[in-house]
Each structure stands twice: as structure tokens, then as C-alpha cells.
Amino acid sequence: MVDMMDLPRSRINAGMLAQFIDKPVCFVGRLEKIHPTGKMFILSDGEGKNGTIELMEPLDEEISGIVEVVGRVTAKATILCTSYVQFKEDSHPFDLGLYNEAVKIIHDFPQFYPLGIVQHD
């Protein structure tokens, strides 16, 4: 079986979740809420729409701010997280709105942003 981390993954926002059921994705958002069990959290994207992130194991660290999640979209249009990274915003705040615009452009012009195409020289 192919490891999820090795697959090409689309960058998406919350409005695109339903289009990517059972596909690997990358989602960036601001942490809004952590479920009391620690096995789920909610991120808001650059448009203020929420995406629910499910974890296999409870969080073992505090998270806050901007988080990038890699995972697979479930049938419930949530993301089953394979890995996540917190962005450091100490000196340079992350512009989630601008990032969201870039995600839209990538999807509006797929001919210029091919996904998963390997070129051999």
C-alpha cells in the first residue's frame, strides 16, 4: 500500500472538501476549537469557513494559530489527519486570506499548476 505522505495532494479550502472525498489533501487554517477528547479540532480557512480535522490519537501537545494539515478527506467531508505542522508567526504573520486566493488560483488554472506529474529529463 502506498504511504499517504508519498502521494501528491491538492491544496484545498473548506469549500472544496466535498469535491475531494477519499483523496489526499493539504489544508491550512487557523485553529478555532479543540474537542475535549483531543482527537478532533476545527480550523477556519481564509474565507472563515470551517474544516473539521480528525486525529487517530489524541493531541500530545498544545497547538494554536495557523496549522497545516495533511490527510485524506472522509465521506463526512472531514480530514483524517496524517500529519500537521504549526506555523510560527512570531515575526511575520501568515496572511490566510492571501493564501486562500492562491489556492483558488491553483484550482482555476490547473493547466499551470499540474498535480502529481513527474517530469524526467
UniProtKB/Swiss-Prot annotation:
Function: As part of the heterotrimeric replication protein A complex (RPA/RP-A), binds and stabilizes single-stranded DNA intermediates that form during DNA replication or upon DNA stress. It prevents their reannealing and in parallel, recruits and activates different proteins and complexes involved in DNA metabolism. Thereby, it plays an essential role both in DNA replication and the cellular response to DNA damage. In the cellular response to DNA damage, the RPA complex controls DNA repair and DNA damage checkpoint activation.
GO molecular function: damaged DNA binding; single-stranded DNA binding
Family: Belongs to the replication factor A protein 3 family.
Principal location: nucleus
Keywords, alphabetical: Acetylation, DNA damage, DNA recombination, DNA repair, DNA replication, Isopeptide bond, Nucleus, Ubl conjugation
Upper lineage: Eukaryota, Metazoa, Chordata, Craniata, Vertebrata
Record note on quaternary structure: Component of the canonical replication protein A complex (RPA), a heterotrimer composed of RPA1, RPA2 and RPA3. Also a component of the aRPA, the alternative replication protein A complex, a trimeric complex similar to the replication protein A complex/RPA but where RPA1 and RPA3 are associated with RPA4 instead of RPA2. Interacts with BRIP1/FANCJ via the RPA1 subunit; following DNA damage they colocalize in foci in the nucleus.
Coiled-coil intervals: none
GO aspect biological process, one term: double-strand break repair via homologous recombination
InterPro entries, sorted: NA-bd_OB-fold, Rfa2
Record note on modification: Ubiquitinated by RFWD3 at stalled replication forks in response to DNA damage: ubiquitination by RFWD3 does not lead to degradation by the proteasome and promotes removal of the RPA complex from stalled replication forks, promoting homologous recombination.
SUPFAM superfamilies cross-referenced by the UniProt entry: Nucleic acid-binding proteins
Protein name, entry field: Replication protein A 14 kDa subunit
CDD domains tied to this protein: RPA3
